[in-house]
Swiss-Prot record:
Location(s), subcellular: Cytoplasm
Protein name: Glutamate-1-semialdehyde 2,1-aminomutase
Modification type N6-(pyridoxal phosphate)lysine: residues: 265
UniProt keywords, alphabetically: Cytoplasm, Isomerase, Porphyrin biosynthesis, Pyridoxal phosphate
Quaternary structure and partners: Homodimer.
Cofactor(s) needed by this chain: pyridoxal 5'-phosphate
GO function term, MF aspect, one: transaminase activity
Family recorded in the similarity comment: Belongs to the class-III pyridoxal-phosphate-dependent aminotransferase family. HemL subfamily.
Gene name as annotated: hemL
Source organism superkingdom: Bacteria
GO biological-process terms attached to the record: protoporphyrinogen IX biosynthetic process
EC class of the enzyme, as a word: isomerase
Predominant location category: cytoplasm
Name of one Pfam family that matches: Aminotran_3
Length: 427
């Protein structure tokens, strides 16, 4: 029963556009009432109606140690007693920057912002300032936040609503954005043939906003070569995959080295944080050292920094966490695949570290066109059955799922039982 959530949603609709502060949360693509959450604990969410859910969304990725993680909460509460934000430099910013930079040979310096959108927007501005060029290349289905020049065939919520671009974005803002097809190097070559003014190519090396779709190694290698040949920077958008797929994010799965990297989600431990980093030569162009302006009132705020430090230090101290989480993710989707096969339901699955994805699709998914061939009507029915049974998957076919450390094999077995019940009801 979701009677209290239904009443809460109606009240929210009076004051908030669509009743939500991020469109996908409204459940428009899957139907039904979005549960209004009262609290989270470990692998669980509890709504205001008293229902418990095994949570595979984990706030869309940040909570690798689960909800209300004790160590993170203690660090946040201790810092909050000292102050929430100062608008000044603090030791904490340097500490978190050092922890991240030490892991990556291609990152000498990093700057913190308050969201993934800000991180990507700032990285692209820096790439343009560094190269003196205006154009950028992005891939259909990759989501890089909601800044105007990037809200073009953006996947995620835009794909869910059948609106791959957004009204309110002037054509002049997007004329410098060239679109390529994910895992299709020929489409990237055509972009470089069309423009000699390309500053950067930005890609989710593990796409998570058209469902989970990893970039193929050969494709990334060819992409690196093209960027080098044309003097363009290669940006890995790891807002989602950073510290989620592995300790080095997607870079733990490829030999390809990007020029710039954006981060978010996990590095904030559940607090609003984004970041972008590169080698010193590039970052030197950023103000106040260089001419490329970027700023933020709450950037590097101490509460977010201690939350991030709590998470990143534990991950660095015990990187075997990723092996455990990957094994659990494989157990989940492997079991799901067997159940789906037994019912004759087409299903494609994939895993990268603690990230997983599944498509109700006849064929393997390698790009956005493939993803859009998935059975969205079946997904909606499946999602409704899972919510009824206390399983909280992302409310869109075009989103990745996440495993947290408290989500153990017992809970995965429980999930598989509910999946079997749900598919039996639908089929």
């Amino acid at each position: 029963m979701l009677s209290k959530s239904e009443a809460a949603y109606k009240e929210a609709l009076r004051y908030i556009p669509g009743g939500v502060d991020s469109p996908v949360r409204a459940f428009k693509s899957v139907g039904g009432v979005p549960p209004f959450i009262d609290r989270g604990e470990g692998a669980f969410l509890y709504d205001i109606d008293g229902n418990r859910y095994i949570d595979y969304v984990q706030s869309w990725g940040p909570l690798i140690f689960g909800h209300a993680d004790k160590e993170t909460l203690e660090a946040v509460c201790e810092q909050a007693q000292k102050g929430l934000s100062f608008g000044t430099p603090t030791l904490l910013e340097t500490e978190l920057a050092r922890e991240i930079v030490e892991l990556f040979d291609n990152i000498d310096k990093i700057r913190f912002v308050s969201s993934g959108t800000e991180a990507v927007m700032s990285a692209i501005r820096l790439a343009r300032g560094y190269t003196g060029r205006d154009d950028i290349v992005k891939f259909e289905g990759c989501y890089h936040g909601h800044s105007d020049s990037l809200l073009v065939s953006a996947g995620s919520g835009a794909a869910t609503f059948g609106n791959p671009s957004s009204p309110g974005v002037p054509a002049d803002f997007t004329k410098h954005t060239l679109l390529a097809r994910y895992n299709d190097i020929e489409s990237v070559k055509r972009c470089f043939q069309a423009s000699d003014n390309i500053a950067c190519v930005i890609i989710e090396p593990i796409a998570g906003n058209m469902g989970l779709v990893p970039a193929e190694e050969e494709f990334l290698q060819d992409l690196r070569k093209l960027c080098d040949e044309h003097g363009a920077l290669l940006i890995f958008d790891e807002v989602m995959s950073g510290f989620r797929a592995s300790l080095k994010g997607a870079q733990g799965f490829t030999s390809v080295v990007p020029d710039m990297v954006t981060f978010g989600k996990v590095i904030g431990g559940g607090m609003p944080v984004g970041a972008f980093g590169a080698r010193a030569e590039i970052m030197a162009h950023l103000s106040p050292e260089g001419p490329v302006y970027q700023a933020g009132t709450l950037s590097g705020n101490p509460v977010a920094m201690v939350a991030g430090l709590s998470v990143i230090r534990r991950l660095k101290n015990d990187p075997s966490i990723y092996e455990v989480l990957e094994a659990r993710a494989k157990g989940l989707v492997g079991g799901f695949k067997k159940i789906a096969d037994s019912f004759g339901v087409p299903l494609q699955v994939d895993v990268r570290g603690s990230m997983f994805g599944f498509f109700f699709n006849e064929k393997p998914v390698k790009n956005f066109d493939d993803a859009k061939q998935s059975d969205l009507e079946f997904f909606a029915k499946f999602h409704q059955e899972m919510i009824k049974r206390g399983i909280y998957f992302a409310c869109s076919q075009f989103e990745a799922g996440f495993i947290c450390t408290p989500l153990d094999e017992k809970l995965i077995d429980e999930t598989l039982e509910k999946i079997e019940e749900g598919l039996k009801k639908i089929v």
